[in-house]
């Protein structure tokens, strides 16, 4: 998944009912049942602090949603024949199902999208120039390996 969209999605998952910060953003309370947070923040974290921790603080950041995807997939230690993308889920899943000779009704059912994420909606509202650059640097291998553009999606 595109690192920008992935980080926004994770932040929204960890912080219920969160609107975009629109440049400044207020601090919000993380749901402690979902996350063991950095002790210095008393469970109150702005999106800017969240990105800073995601991109720099390895000691406290243990959530797999934030790890680089190349590390989670153990690339290049494991050589994958095919890696699908969430952005192309319907197409990629159909490809895999056809390769597995799945029945046509399974392929047709898999093509029905009923849980589209909104994490890509206006990512520019979430990222300042500085935050976007931190993400580009920290997740550079993800951008390269999975051929994601370094620019924020529109």
Q: Language-model segments: which ranges?
A:
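PAPS-dependent sulfotransferase catalytic core
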Residues: 105-153
């Amino acid at each position: 998944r595109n690192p920008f969209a992935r980080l926004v999605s994770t932040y929204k998952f960890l912080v219920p009912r969160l609107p975009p910060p629109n440049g400044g953003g207020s601090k919000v309370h993380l749901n402690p049942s979902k996350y063991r947070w950095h002790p210095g923040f008393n469970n109150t974290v702005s999106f800017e602090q969240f990105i800073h921790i995601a991109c720099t603080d390895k000691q406290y950041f243990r959530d797999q949603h934030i790890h680089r995807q190349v590390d989670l997939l153990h690339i290049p230690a494991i050589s994958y024949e095919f890696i699908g993308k969430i952005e192309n889920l319907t197409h990629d899943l159909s490809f895999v199902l056809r390769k597995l000779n799945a029945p046509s009704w399974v392929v047709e059912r898999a093509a029905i999208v009923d849980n589209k994420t909104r994490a890509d909606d206006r990512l520019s509202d979430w990222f300042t120039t500085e935050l976007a650059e931190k993400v580009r640097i920290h997740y550079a291998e993800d951008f390269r390996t999975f051929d994601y553009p370094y620019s924020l999606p529109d």
